[in-house]
């Protein structure tokens, strides 16, 4: 059974309430599946500009993710998530893949966008698209693929953002989805000599890959 709970967040988000209200983002939780359908990761020969995706059979962690919610969703307010990345080389983005899952309420769709940076936070939209039909939360490892209409040049050493958001009104303003965590966000801990235990980091980094051409 899915659960919602409050946790800390270090990337960026946008809520429908004012910042001074001290809103904190909410997570989605599900029982991870024991059956993993291998992800299809850039079979078209594109190169990796950025990725925190795991191997195809474990591309992301299907048990936890940040909610992506519209203002009319069951959450009662909007919650949008942004993931920063910095290209190592001048590149051209042609495709973005993200681990978005459907949390069982509202229209099964959201808005993905590639954004500029603005003083360390999400800036202006470079290109965006409505993406639909996410796999159910608690399943792995189908990725949501967005092939950009126009290849977008990005500059080495400059921060950009991949953003998952929703419409403020109309179809999709009621969606309750989740951007699942990267498996590369795991760490081991050992308390009082009780043995090593794997756990998710408290940072909760959303899983995604940015692909294209690198001269």
State where each predicted segment sits.
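Sec/Tat signal peptide C-region and signal peptidase I cleavage site
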Residues: 17-21
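Bacterial N-terminal signal peptides
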Residues: 8-16
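Short strand-edge motifs at loop-to-beta-strand transitions and within beta-strands
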Residues: 81-83, 142-146
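Beta-sheet-rich sandwich/jelly-roll-like modules and their strand-loop junctions
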Residues: 22-124, 152-159, 165-215
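Solvent-exposed serine/threonine-rich low-complexity stretches and specific carbohydrate-binding patches
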Residues: 124-137
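Short, surface-exposed linear segments at secondary-structure transitions and domain or protein termini
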Residues: 134-143, 185-191
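Positively charged n-region of N-terminal signal peptides that target proteins for export
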Residues: 1-4
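Short, conserved secondary-structure segments in the cores of folded domains
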Residues: 148-150
């Amino acid at each position: 059974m899915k659960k919602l709970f409050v946790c800390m967040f270090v990337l960026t988000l946008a809520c429908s309430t004012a910042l001074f209200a001290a809103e904190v983002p909410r997570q989605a939780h599900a029982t991870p599946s024991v059956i993993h359908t291998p992800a299809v990761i850039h079979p078209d020969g594109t190169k990796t500009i950025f990725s925190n995706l795991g191997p195809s059979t474990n591309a992301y962690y299907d048990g936890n993710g940040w909610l992506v919610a519209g203002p009319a969703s069951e959450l009662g307010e909007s919650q949008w998530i942004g993931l920063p990345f910095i290209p190592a080389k001048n590149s051209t983005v042609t495709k973005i893949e993200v681990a978005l899952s459907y949390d069982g309420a509202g229209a099964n769709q959201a808005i993905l966008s590639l954004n500029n940076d603005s003083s360390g936070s999400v800036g202006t939209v470079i290109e965006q698209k409505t993406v639909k039909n996410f796999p159910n939360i608690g399943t792995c490892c189908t990725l949501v693929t967005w092939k950009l209409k126009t290849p977008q040049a990005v500059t080495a050493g400059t921060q950009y953002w991949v953003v998952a958001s929703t419409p403020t009104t109309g179809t999709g303003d009621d969606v309750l989805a989740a951007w699942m965590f990267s498996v590369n966000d795991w760490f081991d801990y050992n308390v009082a000599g009780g043995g090593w235990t794997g756990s998710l980091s408290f940072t909760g980094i959303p899983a995604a890959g940015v692909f294209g051409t690198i001269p």
